């Protein structure tokens, strides 16, 4: 099984390790709920070095990425980041990812752990007619520093000059400090940073964060945090069989430049014209019980919806989920252990900056 540069640190902290896309990763360090709450109230740190930073460089880097991605990176300024989907020719989602613009000829993309090899292969397959170099940065590590006290913690472990620059970063902006890249991005619904740095330096950085008030958090808390924030998980909430239209991600497909072609555009426009018969929603269980991926939602007209992600919400103290359901249907219920339990359909975002949105 693959190991991140922080593997020994996780073992020393008595983390429970699990197989995640072939990587041995910490699911928790004791109490998943405590780790979750710590990120909502204080500062938690995550080892996400199983994800991969890929640099796209060359005179046609922007031209290539405008073709590769459904969002339009031509609108990105230097030191800004953008969320978007990478589609196949049928408009199915190959991956969702964040693109960082370093210069007009240098971009960095961070891809999901389970798609590392397939994404890089897809990049290379589609780059053959462009003057670009694609470089997976396998010698880098990634640490997410998340929570309302993330700024305070990170300021304690860097110089005053760097601290001021990090604190000044706006959401979805980033800056390089030598070989370190610090971005004000995250996957929790809280303020925070994602730090991409040389793997040889990550243990010292991790230890410094812990010594200055941060607490480690595992993939279990990362999943409940992103679920509360209404953020998609690739492979659960969407995959190549789904388009952005069915998953509430149409906003991330930029059609404003009608002259721009991108992979999947023709199929996407056809699907958009045809319309989709489902909508993307949040689900809240009104009674005790647990919502899980794969559960059916039944409606009184006989139609069904399906939960793609579900869990107990430590912040809201109820079960929540993300689901696709018929556009017109009433009185939703889920069947849990032979009982029909009422659920409420809400906007697919439950918590922002520690506050309930439902």
From Swiss-Prot:
Reaction catalysis annotation: N(6)-[(R)-S(8)-aminomethyldihydrolipoyl]-L-lysyl-[protein] + (6S)-5,6,7,8-tetrahydrofolate = N(6)-[(R)-dihydrolipoyl]-L-lysyl-[protein] + (6R)-5,10-methylene-5,6,7,8-tetrahydrofolate + NH4(+)
Chaperone found in the keyword field: no
Keyword Transferase: yes
SUPFAM superfamilies the UniProt entry points to: Aminomethyltransferase beta-barrel domain, Folate-binding domain
GO molecular function, one term: aminomethyltransferase activity
One Pfam family it belongs to: GCV_T
CC terms in the record's Gene Ontology section: cytosol; glycine cleavage complex
Gene Ontology terms describing biological process: glycine decarboxylation via glycine cleavage system
EC number: 2.1.2.10
Record keywords: Aminotransferase, Transferase
Role played: The glycine cleavage system catalyzes the degradation of glycine.
Family: Belongs to the GcvT family.
Assembly: The glycine cleavage system is composed of four proteins: P, T, L and H.
Protein's name according to its UniProt entry: Aminomethyltransferase
């Amino acid at each position: 099984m693959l190991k991140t540069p922080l593997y020994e640190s996780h073992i020393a902290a008595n983390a429970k390790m699990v197989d995640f896309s072939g990587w041995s990763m910490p699911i928790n360090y004791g109490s998943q709920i405590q780790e979750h709450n710590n990120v909502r109230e204080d500062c938690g740190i995550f080892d996400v070095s199983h994800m991969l930073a890929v640099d796209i460089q060359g005179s046609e880097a922007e031209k290539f990425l405008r073709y590769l991605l459904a969002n339009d990176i031509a609108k990105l300024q230097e030191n800004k980041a953008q969320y978007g989907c990478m589609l196949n020719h049928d408009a199915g989602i190959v991956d969702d990812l964040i693109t960082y613009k370093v210069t007009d000829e240098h971009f960095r993309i961070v891809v999901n752990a389970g798609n590392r090899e397939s994404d890089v292969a897809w990049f290379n397959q589609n780059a053959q007619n462009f003057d670009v170099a694609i470089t997976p940065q396998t010698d880098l590590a990634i640490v997410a520093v998340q929570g309302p006290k993330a700024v305070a913690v990170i300021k304690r472990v860097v110089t005053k000059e760097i601290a001021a620059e990090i604190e000044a970063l706006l959401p979805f902006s980033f800056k390089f400090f030598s070989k370190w890249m610090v971005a004000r991005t995250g996957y929790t619904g809280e303020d925070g940073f994602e730090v991409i740095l040389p793997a040889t330096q990550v243990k010292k950085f991790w230890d410094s964060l812990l010594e200055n008030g941060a607490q480690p958090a595992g993939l279990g808390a990362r999943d409940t945090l992103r679920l509360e924030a209404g953020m998609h998980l690739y492979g659960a909430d969407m995959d190549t069989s789904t388009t952005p239209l069915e998953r509430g991600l149409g906003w991330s497909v930029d059609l404003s430049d009608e002259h721009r072609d991108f992979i999947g555009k023709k199929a996407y426009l056809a699907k958009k014209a045809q319309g989709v018969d489902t909508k993307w929603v949040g689900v809240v269980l009104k009674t005790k019980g647990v919502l899980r991926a794969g559960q059916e939602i039944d409606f009184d007209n006989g139609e069904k919806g399906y939960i793609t992600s579900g869990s107990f919400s430590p912040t809201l103290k109820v079960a929540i989920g993300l689901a696709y359901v018929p556009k017109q249907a009433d009185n939703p219920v889920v069947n849990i252990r032979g009982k029909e339990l009422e659920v409420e359909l809400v906007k697919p975002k439950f918590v922002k900056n520690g506050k309930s949105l439902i």
